[in-house]
Amino acid sequence: MFQINDNFQKLPGSYLFSTIAKKVAAYQEANPDKEIIRLGIGDVTQPLAPAIIDALHKAVDEMGNAATFHGYAPDLGYEFLRKAISDNDYKARGCDISADEIFVSDGAKSDSANIQELFSANSRIAVTDPVYPVYVDSNVMAGRTGTYDAQTETWSNVIYMPSTADNGFVPELPKEVPDMIYLCLPNNPTGTTLKKEQLQVWVDYANKNGSVIIFDAAYEAYISEADVPHSIYECNGAKTCAIELRSFSKNAGFTGVRLGFTVVPKELKCGDVSLHAMWARRHGTKFNGAPYIVQRAGEAVYSDAGKAQLKDQVAYYMNNAKTIKTGLAEAGFTVYGGVNAPYIWLKTPDQMTSWEFFDYLLENANVVGTPGSGFGPSGEGYFRLTAFGNYENTVKALERIKAL
């Protein structure tokens, strides 16, 4: 008889946001007259920018003409998009990242789950705690995390780096040397960041110890402070120790369009083996390229009109973040984040657990957020609210919470 990958059986429960969706659906079915405001999952609400819509329309018209029709895309991405990314996201910031070091995909989530395939099954990972759950779950599926302790909600072969109020949500360098270090900056879920000199310490640590940093920069467009790096490649030596993940979902509203990319520098090697070559081989085998229409939309993100329109869109969401953070602070909540990231990380009141506060908000304010414990054990007693709602609903949700 056939056998299954037993590692999938090790995953506790369902994926965090799937669990939330089921709980909300059950409540809505039982209370159809209630208006629920969703500030949980980080899905955008504003429409695609006009420059992007124009690019989509033009590309669709091209697909309707035999002379300009495009079939399978190049598996690593169209050159026009890879060059636009290289010029605008990297060379403009002084980072020497060439177009052929950029691998276009259908989003950062799949890349963040798939990148672990480059590493051996006995590699140890280190994650900040709390952390985006995909990093750990994908390594569980690969059989890399050891055994699960339900009481502590930790894995025996995972190195946890607590990010709490006590350390300003800035983790310490791990004492046990990991093979892979996952860093998400600006951070999801805490909304905190590192300054360049702080990030340089991590790069130096990785190079010294032979570790690879998986750097998730999905929220870099929301950085407002000048001394916070947008890319890990702004640090000296990062090209020999870091892989960077990027998304078009949060900076350009592509959650329903799907586009992202991963940077794997040619200098990143394990002995004589190039991780760049490995990822190119993996990408070519398992991915058939993002659609032409979508990649043309991605190119429009870097047009003058696209940049201006998306700057306004980011400002819209960050105004939501400011509104939530200020309002909750006035109501007596302890709040973090919301400055360089579109997330508010708040302490749950009255010693409620994260899920108790989730239920309390849903039932009494009809507002959905994300329980902090879903991001790891150090997230217990915290709660995440997103600034990606529309402004009117954000204000309404805040009024409901303050009235409790």
From Swiss-Prot:
SUPFAM superfamilies: PLP-dependent transferases. Substrate binds at residues 15, 42, 109, 132, 188, 288, 384. It comes from the Bacteria. Its EC number is 2.6.1.83. The keyword Metal-binding does not apply. Pathway: Amino-acid biosynthesis; L-lysine biosynthesis via DAP pathway; LL-2,6-diaminopimelate from (S)-tetrahydrodipicolinate (aminotransferase route): step 1/1. Pfam families: Aminotran_1_2. Pyridoxal 5'-phosphate binds at residues 72, 108-109, 132, 188, 219, 247-249, 258, 288. GO terms for biological process: lysine biosynthetic process via diaminopimelate, diaminopimelate-aminotransferase pathway. It is an enzyme of class 2 (transferase). It catalyses: (2S,6S)-2,6-diaminopimelate + 2-oxoglutarate = (S)-2,3,4,5-tetrahydrodipicolinate + L-glutamate + H2O + H(+). Its cofactor is pyridoxal 5'-phosphate. The modification N6-(pyridoxal phosphate)lysine is found at residue 250. Keywords: Aminotransferase, Pyridoxal phosphate, Transferase. GO terms for molecular function: L,L-diaminopimelate aminotransferase activity; pyridoxal phosphate binding. Homodimer. Involved in the synthesis of meso-diaminopimelate (m-DAP or DL-DAP), required for both lysine and peptidoglycan biosynthesis. Catalyzes the direct conversion of tetrahydrodipicolinate to LL-diaminopimelate. This is LL-diaminopimelate aminotransferase. It comes from Agathobacter rectalis (strain ATCC 33656 / DSM 3377 / JCM 17463 / KCTC 5835 / VPI 0990).
